[in-house]
């Protein structure tokens, strides 16, 4: 595909983002985020120096069409005439209970982290050893087990504290809860949890008008520097010391994360293969069935590396849906996700605190589409979040009857 055509499609998506923002008079609408993200990724791929493969025209057209399906579904979700007038929401007794569970469980979680790190005593760094232990896929693979449920509990406790706060940001217990959640995220070692927590907090604050968009932009720039480069160097993923090439190495790694997924997906999309018919999309429930003793095939969560020409094993959000059901499946699921995001956002704007929290959480898989699928691959995690959040609030209609 020519550079001019690639830029045209990318700029079309940027224009679509502006159009949705003007139509809905809302720059935070999920349709704006979706079209803007893929438009900017396309522009970056076209104009920044890199050694990745050229993107095929069919891949760019597929991304453009799927994004349009997402946007259309998001802007037609629900009605702006819906109202919550006369309805109030109150936090339940689960709100403080989650806080105390997270607080009291943290020492046990930290003890388990130390125990896991000792099984991979390859370096002098606790975090590197812990990361190795948690990411091995051989017979020596280890996990937090049931203690892993403490992480979503800590996250929900923090997000509910923010949503319910009468202060500008967190109240006192909320700040403590935030520190606890960050501790859990650090002990989980993956950037996934740090980014998930930050993105959810940021968009909850935006929806509730606790911060201004420009404040978020500046804060995000600082957070990316700390979250990506700082944590990456902590677990030895980017950089090699603090010499003169460290910054360049980190920037190269950042470019690899940002653009290599698109190149890898294009390579897979251009290679004919038999469809998997749900093995990727339904991996989470299949894994649960396997854990319950059923003899079923579970595809590995970590994908094989391909060379584009740099080695990478990230393939954008689109891989499982195309692998399972080709382009019709991708269009269907993108429309489904767009509908979900649009509905959550509308209800969040109308004041439903449950949807405020859930929308904040849902922005994470939306903004990580350039990287990999975080929708159905984390299905069990989203179910846990949804149940906990819903139980943290009680809806009281005008009549006074609880619902």
Show which residues each predicted segment covers.
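Short helix-coil transition sites and intra-membrane helix breaks within transmembrane domains
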Residues: 191, 310-311, 401-402
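Active-site beta-strand/loop microenvironment that shapes enzyme catalytic pockets
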Residues: 180-188, 193-194, 200-202, 318-346
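Small-residue-enriched transmembrane helix-hairpin modules in multi-pass membrane proteins
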Residues: 129-144, 228-342
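Interfacial segments of alpha-helical transmembrane regions
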Residues: 94-98, 218-222, 273
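Membrane-anchoring hydrophobic segments
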Residues: 1-175, 213-214, 336, 341-349, ...
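Hydrophobic alpha-helical segments of polytopic membrane proteins
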Residues: 61-64, 167-249
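Alpha-helical transmembrane spans of integral membrane proteins, capturing the lipid-embedded, hydrophobic core
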Residues: 39, 105, 178, 197, ...
């Amino acid at each position: 595909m020519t550079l001019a055509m690639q830029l045209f499609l990318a700029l079309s998506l940027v224009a679509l983002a502006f159009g949705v923002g003007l139509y809905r008079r809302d720059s935070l609408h999920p349709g704006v985020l979706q079209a803007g993200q893929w438009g900017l990724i396309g522009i970056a791929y076209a104009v920044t120096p890199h050694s990745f493969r050229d993107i095929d025209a069919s891949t760019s057209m597929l991304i453009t069409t799927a994004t349009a399906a997402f946007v259309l579904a998001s802007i037609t979700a629900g009605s702006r005439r819906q109202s919550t007038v006369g309805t109030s929401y109150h936090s339940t007794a689960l709100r403080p209970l989650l806080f105390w569970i997270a607080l009291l469980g943290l020492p046990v979680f930290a003890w388990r982290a130390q125990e896991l790190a000792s099984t991979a005593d390859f370096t002098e760094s606790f975090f590197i050893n812990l990361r190795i232990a948690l990411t091995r896929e051989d017979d020596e693979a280890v996990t937090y087990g049931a203690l892993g449920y403490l992480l979503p509990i800590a996250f929900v406790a923090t997000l509910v504290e923010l949503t319910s706060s009468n202060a500008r940001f967190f109240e006192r217990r909320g700040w403590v809860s935030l520190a606890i959640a960050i501790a859990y995220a650090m002990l989980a070692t993956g950037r996934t949890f740090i980014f998930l927590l930050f993105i959810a907090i940021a968009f909850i604050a935006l929806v509730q008008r606790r911060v201004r968009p420009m404040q978020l932009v500046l804060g995000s720039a600082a957070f990316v520097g700390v979250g990506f480069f700082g944590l990456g160097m902590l677990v030895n993923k980017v950089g090699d010391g603090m010499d003169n090439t460290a910054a360049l190495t980190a920037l190269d790694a950042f470019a690899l994360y940002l653009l290599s997924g698109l190149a890898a997906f294009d390579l897979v999309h251009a290679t004919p293969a038999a469809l998997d018919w749900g093995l990727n999309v339904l991996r989470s429930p299949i894994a649960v069935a396997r854990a319950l003793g059923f003899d079923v095939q579970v595809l590995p969560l970590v994908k094989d590396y391909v060379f584009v020409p740099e080695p990478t094993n990230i393939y954008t959000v689109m891989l499982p849906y195309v692998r399972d059901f080709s382009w019709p499946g991708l269009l269907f699921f993108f429309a489904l996700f767009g509908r979900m995001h649009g509905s959550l956002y509308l209800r969040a704007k109308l004041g439903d605190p449950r949807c405020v929290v859930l929308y904040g959480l849902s922005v994470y898989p939306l903004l990580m589409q350039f990287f990999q699928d975080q929708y159905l691959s984390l299905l069990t995690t989203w179910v846990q979040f949804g149940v906990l959040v819903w139980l943290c609030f009680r809806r009281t209609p005008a009549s006074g009857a609880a619902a």
